[in-house]
């Protein structure tokens, strides 16, 4: 028979866990501690810890300020980590209006949009376009799935950035993309020309 920990000890460990990873859901925490979701919610309320959506939103707001190529509102999902020119992480939870009616599977355009906007966010340029996208959808996604996208700038050659994006639901990779982004010159933006040369 397992020994139950005291409420004080559980709350201390809960606070520690959330400080280490603010993105744990109440369900995940309940499973970790072997208690009900209701118990975790009560513990969080007593400790003054907001729910996961609020914690994610708070972290994301700080990261939106760092993005140069697009505005924070154009990022699909919540930008929870960003090291400009190197890497980034976003979390996205598709809603009911994003699925095919018959199958209830999330439309690929939303998954791609998360990957594309994260790739655009991680590069250190004031403006850019996708020059090439090599993508692969590996498994279907449903409403309720939490998509965690990780982007990494693999290399930069002149005005081209090579970015890999992988999206997972829990530990299963559902999408993979290799993007070549082309940084747009500041002078070009000032001229407002109609054509951009995107070559490989």
From Swiss-Prot:
Keywords: DNA-binding, Fatty acid biosynthesis, Fatty acid metabolism, Lipid biosynthesis, Lipid metabolism, Repressor, Transcription, Transcription regulation. It comes from the Bacteria. GO terms for biological process: fatty acid biosynthetic process; negative regulation of DNA-templated transcription; negative regulation of fatty acid biosynthetic process. Pfam families: 4HBT. CDD domains: hot_dog. The keyword Transcription regulation applies. One of its GO terms (molecular function) is DNA binding. Transcriptional factor involved in regulation of membrane lipid biosynthesis by repressing genes involved in fatty acid and phospholipid metabolism. HAMAP family: Transcrip_fact_FapR. Belongs to the FapR family. NCBIfam families: PRK04424.1. This is Transcription factor FapR. It comes from Thermoanaerobacter pseudethanolicus (strain ATCC 33223 / 39E) (Clostridium thermohydrosulfuricum).
């Amino acid at each position: 028979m397992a020994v139950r920990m005291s409420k004080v000890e559980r709350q201390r460990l809960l606070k520690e866990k959330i400080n280490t990873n603010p993105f744990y859901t109440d369900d995940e925490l309940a499973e970790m501690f072997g208690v009900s979701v209701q118990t975790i919610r009560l513990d969080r309320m007593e400790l003054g810890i907001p729910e996961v959506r609020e914690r994610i939103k708070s972290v994301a707001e700080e990261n939106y300020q760092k993005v140069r190529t697009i505005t924070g509102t154009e990022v699909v999902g919540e930008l929870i980590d960003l090291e400009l020119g190197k890497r980034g992480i976003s979390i996205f939870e598709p809603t009911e209006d994003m699925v095919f009616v018959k199958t209830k599977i999330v439309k690929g355009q939303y998954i791609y949009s998360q990957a594309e906007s994260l790739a655009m966010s991680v590069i250190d340029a004031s403006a850019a376009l996708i020059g090439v996208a090599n993508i692969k959808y590996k498994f279907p996604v449903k409403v309720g799935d939490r998509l965690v996208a990780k982007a990494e700038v693999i290399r930069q050659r002149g005005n081209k950035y090579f970015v890999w994006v992988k999206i997972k639901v829990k530990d299963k990779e559902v999408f993979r993309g290799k993007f070549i982004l082309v940084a747009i010159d500041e002078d070009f933006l000032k001229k407002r020309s109609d054509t951009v040369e995107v070559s490989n």
